[in-house]
Regions:
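Residue-level preference for short coil/turn positions at secondary-structure junctions
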Residues: 1-2, 82, 126, 158
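Helix-rich "cap/lid" substructures immediately adjacent to catalytic or cofactor-binding pockets
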Residues: 2-87, 164
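Alpha/beta catalytic cores of group-transfer enzymes, especially the acyltransferase/condensing modules
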Residues: 11-13, 40, 100-195
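Generic anion/oxyanion-binding catalytic loop in active/binding sites
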Residues: 18, 58, 97, 130, ...
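A short small-residue
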Residues: 48-55, 95-96, 185-189
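Positions that flank functional sites
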Residues: 52, 91, 193-194
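Gly/Ser-rich oxyanion-binding loop with an adjacent helix/lid
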Residues: 62-132
Length: 198
């Protein structure tokens, strides 16, 4: 068998219902959700499983994603699927630290909860934004947004997918300019943050 890599998502991957099936069918996942909820004094089960708008607010999103990712990872590990390597995008780096046994999930949940609160304080909801630009070279994206204030390239995810970040209105304008320049898609991400603000 080849090597196994676990790659963990950053903010923007959240959705209501994430982790629910694992919670309902795995004692391991249930324990992770319950202990993390207690540690951060937040009902992560309600946050992740019930319809709400808080799931998209940074101060809640980050700990919810971390807890869900760790719960799924631990279920996989219990079933014999263990990572040889782990990596994460932004917030996902904390999950990778847990996967590498460099940080326990309770400490990670506490750290990420504080991180989310501080980030939310720095960039209130609706002020910042990010957009994934697909099918356009980085040099073309950089040209398309060059004259727009308060927007910049934030992530070079992979060839063909680059994320721009900044003031929400500027990001929206940048996404449109990228489409005009030939981008296959430009998708506003479900985040209220931006690199330019942090």
């Amino acid at each position: 068998m080849g090597k196994i890599a676990f790659v963990f998502p950053g903010q923007g991957a959240q959705k209501v219902g994430m982790g629910k099936e694992f919670y309902e069918t795995s004692p391991i996942a249930k324990e992770i959700f319950d202990k993390a909820s207690e540690a951060v004094e937040l009902d992560l089960k309600a946050l992740c499983f019930e319809e709400n708008d808080d799931i998209n607010i940074t101060e809640y999103t980050q700990v919810a994603l971390l807890t869900t990712s760790v719960a799924i990872m631990e279920v996989l590990k219990d079933r014999g699927i263990k990572p040889d390597v782990a990596a994460g995008l932004s917030l996902g780096e904390y999950c990778a630290l847990v996967a590498a046994n460099s940080m326990n999930y309770i400490d990670a949940a506490k750290a990420v909860r504080k991180r989310g609160i501080y980030m939310q304080e720095e960039v209130p909801a609706g002020v910042g934004g990010m957009a994934a630009i697909m099918g356009l070279e980085s040099t073309e994206i950089e040209k398309a947004i060059a004259d727009i204030p308060q927007v910049q390239v934030a992530n070079y995810n992979c060839p063909g997918q680059i994320v721009i970040s900044g003031k929400k209105e500027s990001v929206e304008q940048g996404a449109e300019k990228c489409k005009e320049a030939g981008a296959r898609r430009a998708v506003m991400l479900n985040v209220s943050l931006s690199l330019i603000h942090i």
